[in-house]
Every structure is written in structure tokens, then in C-alpha cells.
Amino acid sequence: MLNIGLSGSTGKMGETILERIDKFKDCKIAAKFNSTNNLDDLDNFCKNSDVIIDFSTPEILEKLINYALKHNTKLVIGTTGLQPQHFKLLEKAAQTLPVLYSANMSIGANLLSYLAKEVTKILDDYDVEILETHHRNKKDSPSGTAVMLAETIASKKGLNITFNRGNRLRSEKEIGISSLRGGNVHGIHEISFLGDDEIITLKHEALNKNSFSIGAIKAAIWLQDKPSALYSMQDIYKI
């Protein structure tokens, strides 16, 4: 039986994972950590977990990694809003532990990323813009998924990523990301390839959080026998 530690257990993603975990026979939630705990509680939390699924806040990541290293606890990180210093921590931890990071753990969003990469190879001279829409209470903007998609395309086209174009003209060497916030939207991501004569748009819409939670649990199960490295969901789906 795989013992999973759930960090961010009282958040929306944590609650959804708790609702879905019973569908998986070979794992259980063995430990929980949330905003009511002290950071030092991460010690026993990691000790009692084989793999941790983290949907908390960037502020606890360094402590979480330190205790995970102490107890050799594998990490699945889904927390968004991470900054460059956080990714450096993940890369360093992955030299010792298997670590999986993804801004979006649904198969649909990862297929969207794969399709965007393939379309980019063909539509090399098209402009690319990304529009992401989320509920009114989402804190980070642009979304981690939008950044993931933009980075995937930019790596193939050698483009810069622009979050706020302001009043300046669009350059030929950039991908723009625009954000909408409102309602109770779980997540919509649209990638538009704009040519002079036609527009091709790829779109993914999450109808609820189930696909994210199922992806996170699958990631924890998949990671349990992997060697130390930094993985993504595309390693699981082999795309």
C-alpha cells in the first residue's frame, strides 16, 4: 500500500483528491498538512509518507523539500505561482529524489501542450497568442498552465513570452498571454495560431477539478519506483 501525504488538504484541490482517492486500490492518504499546521509539522508529515502530493503555497516549498530529503520522501508538486528560485530548489532536490512537477496534471492539458508543439512545427510563420480564463478567486496570473504552454511553444520557435504588452506594438518574436478572471471557471486555455489568411485555435476546458486530482494521484503511483530525476506529466503519458 502506497502511503500518500497530501499537502494543502483543505484547499479545493486537496478536497477533490480526498474525494477521488478511494477509486485507487493500492494507495491511501496517510498524512495531511494544511494551513492550520506549523511548518515544523512537515517533519512527521514527510516521515509518514512515501510520496507527497503538494497543492499548497510556494511559501512552504523550501521547508517541504528539506524534510522530504531528510526522510527520502518522493514529491509530486502541483502548487502554482512558483518563482525561479523555487524551480532551482526542485532541480536540486531531483538530484537526490524523484520529483514530478506540473502546472496542470490533467491529461487534456498535457495533450494540448503536445498538440501545440506539433502544430508549431508546421505553422512556423504564424503569430501565437494564448488566452487563459479562470474563476474570480484565482491568485496567480497568468496561470501556470498558460506559462507551461507558452514555454513549450517558445522553445520550438525561439520566441519571447510577453505577459503585459501594454501600449506597445506586438513584435514578431513573441508569444502573448492574456488572462480573464471571473465566475466559477475551472480553467480554459486557448492557443491561437494567427496567419494572414486563417486562424487555427486549440482549446482545452476543464469542467471540474476531477481530471487534475486523478492526474495527481496517478503521478504519485507512477513516481514510487522511479530513480532520482525531475519529471513532468508528459513523462507519464509518454508524449
From Swiss-Prot:
<dbReference type="GO" id="GO:0005829">
    <property type="term" value="C:cytosol"/>
</dbReference>
<dbReference type="Pfam" id="PF05173">
    <property type="entry name" value="DapB_C"/>
</dbReference>
<dbReference type="InterPro" id="IPR023940">
    <property type="entry name" value="DHDPR_bac"/>
</dbReference>
<comment type="pathway">
    <text>Amino-acid biosynthesis; L-lysine biosynthesis via DAP pathway; (S)-tetrahydrodipicolinate from L-aspartate: step 4/4.</text>
</comment>
<keyword id="KW-0028">Amino-acid biosynthesis</keyword>
<feature type="binding site">
    <location>
        <begin position="8"/>
        <end position="13"/>
    </location>
    <ligand>
        <name>NAD(+)</name>
    </ligand>
</feature>
<keyword id="KW-0220">Diaminopimelate biosynthesis</keyword>
<keyword id="KW-0520">NAD</keyword>
<feature type="active site" description="Proton donor/acceptor">
    <location>
        <position position="134"/>
    </location>
</feature>
<dbReference type="GO" id="GO:0008839">
    <property type="term" value="F:4-hydroxy-tetrahydrodipicolinate reductase"/>
</dbReference>
<dbReference type="GO" id="GO:0016726">
    <property type="term" value="F:oxidoreductase activity, acting on CH or CH2 groups, NAD or NADP as acceptor"/>
</dbReference>
<dbReference type="InterPro" id="IPR000846">
    <property type="entry name" value="DapB_N"/>
</dbReference>
<keyword id="KW-0521">NADP</keyword>
<dbReference type="Pfam" id="PF01113">
    <property type="entry name" value="DapB_N"/>
</dbReference>
<comment type="function">
    <text>Catalyzes the conversion of 4-hydroxy-tetrahydrodipicolinate (HTPA) to tetrahydrodipicolinate.</text>
</comment>
<protein>
    <recommendedName>
        <fullName>4-hydroxy-tetrahydrodipicolinate reductase</fullName>
        <ecNumber>1.17.1.8</ecNumber>
    </recommendedName>
</protein>
<dbReference type="InterPro" id="IPR036291">
    <property type="entry name" value="NAD(P)-bd_dom_sf"/>
</dbReference>
<dbReference type="GO" id="GO:0051287">
    <property type="term" value="F:NAD binding"/>
</dbReference>
<feature type="binding site">
    <location>
        <begin position="144"/>
        <end position="145"/>
    </location>
    <ligand>
        <name>(S)-2,3,4,5-tetrahydrodipicolinate</name>
    </ligand>
</feature>
<keyword id="KW-0457">Lysine biosynthesis</keyword>
<feature type="active site" description="Proton donor">
    <location>
        <position position="138"/>
    </location>
</feature>
<feature type="binding site">
    <location>
        <begin position="78"/>
        <end position="80"/>
    </location>
    <ligand>
        <name>NAD(+)</name>
    </ligand>
</feature>
<feature type="binding site">
    <location>
        <position position="135"/>
    </location>
    <ligand>
        <name>(S)-2,3,4,5-tetrahydrodipicolinate</name>
    </ligand>
</feature>
<dbReference type="InterPro" id="IPR022664">
    <property type="entry name" value="DapB_N_CS"/>
</dbReference>
<dbReference type="GO" id="GO:0050661">
    <property type="term" value="F:NADP binding"/>
</dbReference>
<feature type="binding site">
    <location>
        <begin position="102"/>
        <end position="105"/>
    </location>
    <ligand>
        <name>NAD(+)</name>
    </ligand>
</feature>
<dbReference type="GO" id="GO:0009089">
    <property type="term" value="P:lysine biosynthetic process via diaminopimelate"/>
</dbReference>
<keyword id="KW-0560">Oxidoreductase</keyword>
<dbReference type="GO" id="GO:0019877">
    <property type="term" value="P:diaminopimelate biosynthetic process"/>
</dbReference>
<comment type="similarity">
    <text>Belongs to the DapB family.</text>
</comment>
<dbReference type="InterPro" id="IPR022663">
    <property type="entry name" value="DapB_C"/>
</dbReference>
<keyword id="KW-0963">Cytoplasm</keyword>
